[in-house]
Amino acid sequence: MSRKQLALFEPVLLVQALTDAVKKLSPRAQWRNPVMFVVWAGSVLTTLLTLAMVTGQIAGSALFTGVISLWLWFTVLFANFAEALAEGRSKAQANSLKGVKKTAFARRLRAPRHDAQADNVPAAELRKGDIVLVKAGDIIPCDGEVIEGGASVDESAITGESAPVIRESGGDFASVTGGTRILSDWLVIACSVNPGETFLDRMIAMVEGAQRRKTPNEIALTILLIALTIVFLLATATLWPFSAWGGNAVSVTVLVALLVCLIPTTIGGLLSAIGVAGMSRMLGANVIATSGRAVEAAGDVDVLLLDKTGTITLGNRQASDFIPARGVDERALADAAQLASLADETPEGRSIVILAKQRFNLRERDMQSLHATFVPFTAQSRMSGINIDNRMIRKGSVDAIRRHVESNGGHFPADVEQNVENVARLGATPLVVVEGARVLGVIALKDIVKGGIKERFAQLRKMGIKTVMITGDNRLTAAAIAAEAGVDDFLAEATPEAKLALIRQYQAEGRLVAMTGDGTNDAPALAQADVAVAMNSGTQAAKEAGNMVDLDSNPTKLIEVVHIGKQMLMTRGSLTTFSIANDVAKYFAIIPAAFAATYPQLNALNVMGLHSPNSAILSAVIFNALIIIFLIPLALKGVSYKPLSASAMLRRNLWIYGLGGLVVPFIGIKVIDVLLTLLGLA
């Protein structure tokens, strides 16, 4: 992925964020955040009190009240700035996507074939179901499926990846995205969406959406923060009659300052920024999440369903050997295997053709001159092949070929069963070749497990995440590769129905499941999974079923998605712990300052030795505002994440953010008090 990453504090974004922070001072904007709305209300109240004192309408220190009011406004502005900066980063990413959208004309065909008559129409007039022809140099005008042709496509505007990709009709690489460019050849595309509903439009709307829906965890945390705010509001309100009864009523300004310092303003001011930044980090990883809910679910995932090919193994299985059945010549097996693979454009199919050529000098033959019919592979049949003259040649998985042989009145030889088992035990994939009802032998396909993948799975296991390998291989091959890779479990001979059933089984146990997919046959399982990452190179059905799209089309990205989700949850939890813990230091600063005149015994709580009641209150309010600014980088970047168990992460966060939340305010408030005293402002 080569898309330029935004600096944490881009100057242009800072200026825009400052402007937006001021705009967010309106009551309507503040009402969306109940904790900060209380601070906003306190700011308005103390501002009115300051004006009343300046004009002589009420008695009191206009300077002290004015300074308190100023720092309360700063508290609100800093919280607004954090949210605006996070949103600004997302909007900047959205603007880069908007640059991809270009006004273009399209060749709308009157019939679904490339030589049909075409009309030039604006791309905005295209509707779902329209057929368009795009040629080399053209911008693809709409999202759709290739129904004819094949071409090299530059998708760098969407994915950031400069290497072109092949898009062709049939299979799982027929999906194209509007805004990408054709580099060579031509494609006939059936538009799959209406204007304004394209993948690019949805990406932009998701990234820059101002009305971001809160996630379930955010809602739960907001309810907790509101409850704490109400408790502290009631507690603060009851302190005035207590102090008045003692003969020295506390001023409204001090009570407002006390309330603002007691309520969890730190997490209240940063909560929205954390959520927006989480989605922004996901986009930085070239993954588009349809909502914050999907990012949050990624952090709670405890089961990963991982495709073997491309995720656990390198994905370029190569034919390594022909093992004939008893009584069959190896050359005859190689010839039949090559014929069955002539129209098979998969890496495995091409490698079979090449191996037969290398071993026996068998040259490729033209399908048309042979008057042959190719039988493509399907997830249901799990075999492919060719019909030529009176010959019916198939290659496929052991079970699929066994069913095929038995349905044609044949018998599956015991020696072939043994050869299949031997190949599988070595971790290779056996493909069986059959002609009619006669089994000819086995092709061995070697697969290589990715380096370092076993260690990554060990880290996931420490975090309490179960890894399950999904493969179409037989159980012996799957077991050998699973053991080598270090996964916890595997699903062999997987069909779409089996994947769906496995996901439902785990969900019935109360677990959250994540998976990747790219084909139409993956759509049901993607729709069922809690976190479903569809490949951008996959079909439209897969992308619509998933709640995330990986622009790099890298199945391994699922592990990174889980890491980002967990980092967002950890950031939220860590800053909540810090916010609640640092209230303790504020108690020791404000309560003695506010009530020592009425109850002298409270002077014992002034453990920081603050200079005066006014400096103590002002120091606490200033610290309360500044800590939001200091924590903005942490909220946007996320806390340092290490793959640990839940209990180990809890202990680590309590030590760092719990203890830190207790210690930092004591130091910060004391330093501010000393500075105020030195400057003569105490």
Curated annotation (Swiss-Prot):
Its Enzyme Commission number? 7.2.2.6
**Transmembrane ranges?**
34-54, 58-78, 219-239, 254-274, 588-608, 616-636, 662-682
| PANTHER family named among the record's database cross-references | POTASSIUM-TRANSPORTING ATPASE ATP-BINDING SUBUNIT
Q: Where does ATP bind?
A: D344, E348, F377, T378, A379, Q380, S381, R382, M383, S384, K395
Q: What is this protein called?
A: Potassium-transporting ATPase ATP-binding subunit
| EC class | translocase
GO molecular function terms attached to this record = ATP binding; ATP hydrolysis activity; magnesium ion binding; P-type potassium transmembrane transporter activity
Q: How does it sit in the membrane?
A: Multi-pass membrane protein
UniProt cross-references to InterPro entries, sorted A to Z: ATPase_P-typ_cyto_dom_N, ATPase_P-typ_P_site, ATPase_P-typ_TM_dom_sf, ATPase_P-typ_transduc_dom_A_sf, HAD-like_sf, HAD_sf, P-type_ATPase_bsu_IA, P_typ_ATPase
Q: Where in the cell is it found?
A: Cell inner membrane
| Binding-site positions, Mg(2+) | D518, D522
Q: State the active site.
A: D307 (4-aspartylphosphate intermediate)
